[in-house]
Regions:
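Glycine-enriched, solvent-exposed interface loops adjoining structured elements
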Residues: 2-175
Length: 175
């Protein structure tokens, strides 16, 4: 990303250079933000939630489940029951096993090439004003980022089948 804005690459986020300070402060948030913007197939996980011994306050919920530590975005739970998210806990009225599909903080080693390229442009777009004081560089990288983002989402979507909607309220109401 630094090369894209005309700076020298860094080998570590540790250090006192302007580029290292900016990268160290912005990198984790930019990556996590990009991971949660779309339901990336490579960043999906399915896991069973642990039922806690905590007792919910009030009468709205009966059970509290612990969300996974690496969860960034909850996609769905199974079985499908009403639930509420409070901090790192899931409150619901089920006491059986609950499974969650979610986006996790996928390590760089698992990123496909299309996502890595998109992240490069996202970083360059956000680094440009802080490191280079260049609005022109930011605008150019923003256009590249938008294109890379579209292509990454398209490529990712081609690898995973579409799950059909199983709920048919208009048909069910007739019978």
């Amino acid at each position: 990303a630094l090369i894209l804005i005309g700076d020298l690459p860094i080998t570590s986020l540790e250090g006192n250079s302007r580029a290292q300070t900016v990268a160290n402060n912005l990198y984790p948030n930019i990556v996590q933000n990009e991971l949660t913007k779309y339901r990336w197939g490579f960043a999906r996980k399915k896991g069973q939630l642990d039922l806690t011994t905590e007792v919910p306050v009030g009468t709205e919920w009966q059970s509290i489940y612990q969300l996974p530590a690496d969860l960034l975005f909850l996609i769905k739970i199974n079985p499908q029951v009403p639930y509420g998210l409070y901090g790192d806990k899931l409150y619901c009225n089920a006491s059986s096993a609950i499974f969650a599909d979610y986006i996790y903080n996928a390590p760089e080693s698992t990123w496909p090439v299309y996502f890595s390229k998109m992240i490069e442009y996202a970083l360059a777009m956000d680094f440009a004003p802080s490191i280079r004081d260049s609005a022109a560089s930011m605008d150019a990288n923003a256009r590249q980022y938008l294109n890379a983002s579209r292509m990454a989402r398209f490529t990712d979507s081609q690898q995973y089948p579409v799950v059909p909607i199983t709920d048919r309220p208009f048909i069910n109401v007739r019978f």
